[in-house]
Amino acid sequence: MTGFRDQLGVHAQALVLRETRNNLLTSNIANAATPHYKARDIDFGAELARASGNGTLRTTEARHFAAGGPAARGEALYRDPVSPSLDGNTVEMAVEQMEFAENTLRYQTSLALLNRRISGLMTAIKGE
């Protein structure tokens, strides 16, 4: 028998990661005028794979390198700007706003899918 968490699938993990990404993006936007501030983000796909247990790399030969670096540890990465600012700030407002809007839309979609999944489970529990 599978647990309740297993029934929610990847949607619950996606929701948490979307919230984390949203916090990073809003921090970037809030610090757009802060000198030497470095814009940060996460690799959502890699983080979701890691959170769902699919993120471990399989080594098929002894000479393979182990995965490493900030992305492998689940840390926020620094974003490289297309056109860097003279004050050292790497926030590009248009990029941040676009990423924020897309992430918000995907957050709402994940929430709707999770709500539907929970409604389906409640219907099954009630026997309707």
UniProtKB/Swiss-Prot annotation:
GO terms for biological process: bacterial-type flagellum-dependent swarming motility. InterPro entries: Flagellar_basal_body_rod_CS, FlgB. It is found in: Bacterial flagellum basal body. The keyword DNA damage does not apply. GO terms for cellular component: bacterial-type flagellum basal body, rod. Structural component of flagellum, the bacterial motility apparatus. Part of the rod structure of flagellar basal body. NCBIfam families: FlgB. This is Flagellar basal body rod protein FlgB. It comes from Cereibacter sphaeroides (strain ATCC 17029 / ATH 2.4.9).
